[in-house]
C-alpha cells in the first residue's frame, strides 16, 4: 500500500524524523564524551565550556552539542579576600633608591585606601604588610621592584577604597 502525496504517511514520517532529530540533539547535550572521543572529534582535553559559547561568532553552532559534551566547567573564581588594613613600611633615608615606591608614598594615592598606613622604619626596605580583622599581620610582601601602578593595583584588590 503506497502512500499518495498528501496522504497520512507523509506527515507522520516527517513528524517521526523531526522527533528523532530532537531526541538525538537532547541526548547529545546531556552526554559527556570520553576524552578519546573528544580527541577524535578534534577537541582538546582542556576545553572550557566558555569556549563553546564563542562558536556562534564563527557560524559553527553545529559543533555546539559535541563541544558541550567535551568541555569542562570553568572553576568559579574565589571571592576576593579583603584585608582590614595594610602597613607600607619604608625607610625614609632609602626611599630615594626606590623611585616608584617613593612616587606612590608621596602621592595622594595612599589616601584612596581604607586602613593603609605608611610607616617610616629606619633601615627597612619597602615592605607591605596586610592585616587581618584583629590587626595581626596576615601577609608580608617585599615590594622592592614594584612600580607605582603595581602597588596601586595590588592594594585595589586587597583593601577597600575610600
Swiss-Prot record:
Protein origin, superkingdom: Eukaryota
Subcellular location: Endoplasmic reticulum lumen
Keyword Endoplasmic reticulum (UniProt): yes
One Gene Ontology cellular component: endoplasmic reticulum lumen
Signal peptide positions on this chain: 1-28
A Pfam match: Sep15_SelM
Keyword ATP-binding (UniProt): no
Keyword terms of this UniProt record: Endoplasmic reticulum, Selenocysteine, Signal
Cited function: May be involved in redox reactions associated with the formation of disulfide bonds. May contribute to the quality control of protein folding in the endoplasmic reticulum. May regulate protein folding by enhancing the catalytic activity of UGGT1/UGCGL1 and UGGT2/UGCGL2.
Subunit-structure text: Forms a tight complex with UGGT1/UGCGL1. Interacts with UGGT2/UGCGL2. Interacts with RDH11.
This protein's name: Selenoprotein F
Taxonomic source organism: Sus scrofa (Pig)
